[in-house]
Amino acid sequence: MSQLSSTLKRYTESARYTDAHYAKSGYGAYTPSSYGANLAASLLEKEKLGFKPVPTSSFLTRPRTYGPSSLLDYDRGRPLLRPDITGGGKRAESQTRGTERPLGSGLSGGSGFPYGVTNNCLSYLPINAYDQGVTLTQKLDSQSDLARDFSSLRTSDSYRIDPRNLGRSPMLARTRKELCTLQGLYQTASCPEYLVDYLENYGRKGSASQVPSQAPPSRVPEIISPTYRPIGRYTLWETGKGQAPGPSRSSSPGRDGMNSKSAQGLAGLRNLGNTCFMNSILQCLSNTRELRDYCLQRLYMRDLHHGSNAHTALVEEFAKLIQTIWTSSPNDVVSPSEFKTQIQRYAPRFVGYNQQDAQEFLRFLLDGLHNEVNRVTLRPKSNPENLDHLPDDEKGRQMWRKYLEREDSRIGDLFVGQLKSSLTCTDCGYCSTVFDPFWDLSLPIAKRGYPEVTLMDCMRLFTKEDVLDGDEKPTCCRCRGRKRCIKKFSIQRFPKILVLHLKRFSESRIRTSKLTTFVNFPLRDLDLREFASENTNHAVYNLYAVSNHSGTTMGGHYTAYCRSPGTGEWHTFNDSSVTPMSSSQVRTSDAYLLFYELASPPSRM
């Protein structure tokens, strides 16, 4: 996968995404972290960045007020807890252990490259026909003209350009741009439906000034002329290579005997250009049973806000995408371009075709969905009250109640749990507790000198007692001074869907590296009761999805292993390719995000 530039500077300007509704702090004290802290400010420091001029033409034609501020200093009163960087105080490390990770770094690359726009940046901007040396009318005469154009470029449907030569040959780079343009024209001429869809979205024929080009991919697609079939606002691309346009579908070997019920949810997702991180997470969420039903049964409609300032586009496009996946045949490939448009409006860091981190994408996506279906329309004023006199269990319940007064959605019902952090003074024995909501847990990978560790080893390392001494000494409110303390984490409230992030990304002053340690995790009956802060019998989980990252920190690829909520069978989702797999193949050293669902009591007998 090619290395691309960072998010365009213009989409990280805080003024363009600032909403007064998001600029008010509400629930408790908020300590910024890498996920929710001053995103634009850290990106725009001139000493860190070397931005080149951005074209005046833009996909977003005017400043938007959609979604939260890109500064993300406040998340409508709820902290966006990024588990990879601790907050200002030692108590802020409520969901992670390990070193800080700089913004923009991830397993999918980015840490080894400067921010900015490279010379050959493939941006999400319309391509001007004049700049590309072709015009719409010249290239729509006939398919024979297009064939000659491809021939003059010494290319074919399967031609590949070595990206290593692009920097050495400006003419070759220009040829690649022309190839992308001609590709869109070829599709237009060969598929009348494509032209109709294009004209409906971008203007009638004769008034269009841009070439109907696809969003530039990171490489020349294998299918120059795929079968095109529109469904609603989404596009289904048949997977047959070299097919003639038409309504027929290519058959996949071994699937002819599958009935429609067993085949549901097995559509692939088209890679739009370094979007494997997005496709991997979307397939994992598509196989989350209750979230899938929430979209398929259109239950989200009753939670949408219909005011003049309401933002609902992200959840609507997400639901439509899930509906398309589950109503398509296994031979279909769904293009998530409409969804990508909305997620990059909500989180401008995903504008363009950069390599991104799957966990960061999951955090932004869940937060955006939660905000749009939050049942709380009018948040109460924050009235801090002292709960230290209450027993820990009662204090945890009160803190959870206060959280739900401000943040209450179906998304939160599924993914949000509560973490308990305790500090015990070694001098006087006083113990103070803090309760924080969490969306996932970032687990350090235990290093024991062996090539293999277990998931329970990682959980024990996450919850083990740490001694805070020296410069790390906190202030004891009883001793009224900085004292040596013992810190410990435990889980106060277990979520229905538990997402475990394996911290394979290791930072050092010299370089960034990826840990390839094999983590042995159970597929069934993950018993986490030993990590509960109070006695509970409802803390056993079953695995249903894994987001995998293969490769290095300089470049890699994301895939997903998912168990169908209907059939219980496992499949590999590799962008547009979906293949069956055995449950014995799920455990690999590429596992990055583990999705567990809370087991029902009968399954634990």
Swiss-Prot record:
Induction annotation: Down-regulated by cisplatin (at protein level).
MF-aspect GO terms: cyclin binding; cysteine-type deubiquitinase activity; cysteine-type endopeptidase activity; identical protein binding; metal ion binding; ubiquitin protein ligase binding
Effect of residue 549 to A: Loss of enzymatic activity. Increases the steady-state level of MDM2 and MDM4 that leads to attenuation of MDM2-mediated degradation of p53/TP53 and MDM4. Increases the level of p53/TP53 and MDM4 ubiquitin conjugates
UniProt region (Necessary for interaction with MDM4), positions on chain: 1-200, 403-503
Record keyword Metal-binding present: yes
Pfam families named among the record's database cross-references: UCH
Top EC category: hydrolase
Cell cycle as UniProt keyword: yes
Biased composition (Basic and acidic residues): 90-100
Record-linked CDD domains: Peptidase_C19R
Keyword terms: Biological rhythms, Cell cycle, Cytoplasm, Hydrolase, Membrane, Metal-binding, Myogenesis, Nucleus, Protease, Thiol protease, Ubl conjugation pathway, Zinc
Catalytic residues, chain numbering: 276, 557
InterPro entries tied to this protein: Papain-like_cys_pep_sf, Peptidase_C19_UCH, Ub_carboxyl-term_hydrolase, USP_CS, USP_dom
Subcellular location: Cytoplasm; Cytoplasm, Perinuclear region
Tissues and organs where the protein is expressed, per its UniProt entry: Expressed in mesangial cells of the kidney and in different types of glomerulonephritides (at protein level).
Stretches the record annotates as Disordered: 71-107, 237-264
Catalytic activity: Thiol-dependent hydrolysis of ester, thioester, amide, peptide and isopeptide bonds formed by the C-terminal Gly of ubiquitin (a 76-residue protein attached to proteins as an intracellular targeting signal)
Notes on the domains: The different N-terminus extensions of isoform 1 and isoform 4 determine their respective subcellular localization and differential effect on myoblast fusion and accumulation of muscle-specific proteins. The different N-terminus extensions of isoform 1 and isoform 4 are not essential for their catalytic activity.
Known function: Hydrolase that deubiquitinates polyubiquitinated target proteins such as MDM2, MDM4 and CCND1. Isoform 1 and isoform 4 possess both ubiquitin-specific peptidase and isopeptidase activities. Deubiquitinates MDM2 without reversing MDM2-mediated p53/TP53 ubiquitination and thus indirectly promotes p53/TP53 degradation and limits p53 activity. Has no deubiquitinase activity against p53/TP53. Prevents MDM2-mediated degradation of MDM4. Plays a role in the G1/S cell-cycle progression in normal and cancer cells.
Family as reported in the entry's similarity comment: Belongs to the peptidase C19 family. USP2 subfamily.
Description of how the protein assembles with itself and partners: Homooligomer. Found in trimeric complex with MDM2 and MDM4 and USP2. Interacts with CCND1; the interaction is direct and promotes its stabilization by antagonizing ubiquitin-dependent degradation. Interacts (via N-terminus and C-terminus) with MDM2. Interacts with MDM4. Interacts with PER1. Interacts with KCNQ1; counteracts the NEDD4L-specific down-regulation of I(Ks) and restore plasma membrane localization of KCNQ1. Isoform 4: Interacts with NHERF4 and CLTC.
Official protein name in the record: Ubiquitin carboxyl-terminal hydrolase 2
Species, as recorded: Homo sapiens
